[in-house]
Amino acid sequence: MTDLEFMDRAEKLLLAVEQSCDRINDTTDADLDGQRTGGMVTITFRNRSQIVINLQKPLHEIWMAAQSGGYHFRHDGTAWMDTKGAGEFFAALSHNATLQAGEALQFTD
């Protein structure tokens, strides 16, 4: 993948995360605070815990830091997949957000 392709796909992912935060806030009482700064989105939960998602341009990866640990995702041509085989980005984000929020949350692309 070229740098331009990476940036296009990565920007779409970050936008989808922001839009999911808005949708979740509109349809639940989760009260997420999603803040975008450049190539990073920080999601802050009611309990003040956070999930941080950021671009790693030189590696063509998306990194996610959650209470459960750090995750690296690389686009496989179809989806952003964990580099250690732990699954797809939005499934991992939904799982970690659910754990940190204490209620079921669904992030989608």
UniProtKB/Swiss-Prot annotation:
Query: Entry's Pfam families?
Result: Frataxin_Cyay
Question: Which UniProt keywords are listed?
Answer: Iron, Metal-binding
Q: Which GO terms describe its cellular component?
A: cytoplasm
Keyword Thylakoid set for record: no
Which GO biological process annotations does it have? iron-sulfur cluster assembly
Q: Which molecular function terms from Gene Ontology are attached?
A: ferric iron binding
Q: Which InterPro entries match?
A: CyaY, Frataxin/CyaY, Frataxin/CyaY_sf, Frataxin_CS
User: Can you tell me which family this protein belongs to?
Assistant: Belongs to the frataxin family.
Instruction: Please explain the role this protein plays, according to its UniProt record.
Output: Involved in iron-sulfur (Fe-S) cluster assembly. May act as a regulator of Fe-S biogenesis.
Q: What is this protein called?
A: Iron-sulfur cluster assembly protein CyaY
| Species of the source | Acidovorax ebreus (strain TPSY)
